[in-house]
Amino acid sequence: MVDLVYGRGITDLIREFPFYLTFFRNIIDIKLFHKKRTLYGSADIINVCNLHCSHCYWWLNREDENNELSAEDWRTIVRNTFKKQRLIGVTLVGGEPTMRPDVIDVFCQEMPGRVCVVTNGTFPLKRFENLYFYWVSLDGTEKVHDSIRGEGSYQKTRDTIMEYISGPSRKGKPAWKDIWITMTINSLNYRTVTDLADEWKDKINKIGFQFHTPFVTGDPLWLPFGETRNEVVDCIISLKKKYPNYI
């Protein structure tokens, strides 16, 4: 199968044509007529996580663990909200979303090929037939990642990824295409951007970078605007030129 757009083949693009048509109409409305349009969605599907990462905002807003929706409740929400607006895609977050495979399955059934799941990768990754991809969080190389997410967490995530990509293809595409890595850059790990990108090159599909957003005044993980941050941006731009289909 030929990949034309981020892992999508010709049959995928034909099937999803109505969504792309709506997407470009919304872009025109936004750019030309300054209308408010929804292009992409996100859903917190679980209020539980097995890690306590030092940079994560979720712990500040944590609610009752028992106050969660059933899979069929989520199906109703998907049909009445996400699908009605013809969103181009949806990202599932938490907590740790892979602890609710029943909900992930509902989203994949209702929005085939348009669902990505953000995960810490410490649990085995299920092969959902209609999943778009997994966003696996790695916050730098092993030592700094473990200082943020807990001792041994990097190796657990690495083992999970390697186990998944050693598995069978899905819809004619090799398993490694399902794995994208995301790194949240902060004051502890910014020096490891290049090393992490090089380490995972030719193992997974893509890697993306974002800067840590401070959620309290004086957040020590915040990388302030200035020379150092600019150097990190320049580094990412250089990596993009070096690995245009990977970064």
Residue ranges and their predicted role:
Residues V2-R127:
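Conserved alpha-helical substructure of the radical SAM core
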Residues M1-L4, D12, D64, Y132-D139, ...:
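Radical SAM enzyme [4Fe-4S]-AdoMet core and its adjacent flexible, acidic
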